[in-house]
Amino acid sequence: MTEPTADSGFETRAVHAGQAFDPTTGAVIPPVHFSTTYAQDGIGGLREGYEYGRSGNPTRTALETQLAALEGGAHALSFASGLAAEDALLRAALTPGDEVLLGNDVYGGTYRLIARVLGAWGVSVRVVDMSDLDAVRAALEERPARIVWVETPSNPLLRITDVAGLARLGHDAGALVVVDNTFASPALQQPLALGADVVVHSTTKYLGGHSDVVGGALVLNDDALYGEVKFLQFAVGAVSGPLDAWLTTRGIKTLALRMQRHSENAQQVASFLSAHPAVARVYYPGLPTHPGHELAARQMSGFGGIVSVALDDAASARRFAESTRLFQLAESLGGVESLMNYPDEMTHASVRGTELAVPPEVVRLSVGIESAADLLADLDQGLARL
């Protein structure tokens, strides 16, 4: 099989990048390489560069090849979790006294990592509404930042940031521009092509896509930064295991199809909720009423599978989150099954009382690929119980 090129279609790259058949047996699906160590042809005589499982593994290499091909990057690194990927990048790019300019609507774990873990080593963090480029410009003029870090769409309020505009502002200020592309996935958005320096993923979510593997990834073009992050990955050991890498690779092969269905179902869910009298507000970039709708339509090829909704008050939100049947109350997102999350006490509990706190009346829906009619019926009965 010939490795797909950058000109190959996204779906072709998702299926074939890094997936050459096994040369020994002809197996169409590459095997999972569980070996922790590799025989050498004499001292230092490595075969294909493999020495020890922490420094490299063929199954992990296959996943990294696939990830780089999908994001259009020169390099990719696969980690044991999304936060492990973030930690390696931050440690490689920052020194004590540096500052991260962070979106004011990001995953609570990211803020916790920077503010509490790296904060103890002299790294500071400021937050700003990344959907307001004037506010970003003012923040960078007030004080320089080493990294500008954004999620778009953001978690959980689905704010949309102009990645190309943000990249220009960040680069003019000498900052590294990092985009967490977890919510959109490379099937819907290509941040590197828009000017970002690094793309971050929790591969646990849409890339894996089946709620059965935890992982993270970085995709980037800069050779020097790649070398620094790869060294830290090796030194710390936060690598994805062979089976985790293989499961993620398998999930990615259907990514384009899944994201299309997630987006279609989410659009129907958002429209239904917008018309429901018990709902105060719906956050979904696919709605024309969303402030970032036109921007999302320009820089994304679909609006994604996450819908957040505000009820009248926190008590109503809690009851709704506990009243659905198909939508399971659980952490995480991006699997084929629909999930319900109450951010204030679940995914974003670590930022309660801060400027990143999520309003307690908000519930986040990860809309799966089930029958849309069944999902709407489930939401309808849940809202009827308020």
Task: For each feature predicted by the language model, list its residue ranges.
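Glycine-rich beta-alpha junction loops
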Residues: 19-21, 34-40, 183, 205, ...
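Conserved C-terminal alpha-helix-loop-beta "cap" of PLP-dependent enzymes
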Residues: 281-363, 367
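Conserved N-terminal alpha-helix of the aminotransferase class I/II PLP-enzyme fold
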Residues: 37-87, 109-116
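N-terminal "arm"/small-domain region of PLP-dependent enzymes with the aminotransferase-like
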Residues: 2-57, 63-66
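Short amphipathic alpha-helical segments
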Residues: 48, 74, 214, 248, ...
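PLP-dependent enzyme catalytic core of the Aspartate aminotransferase-like
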Residues: 115, 124, 138-141, 258, ...
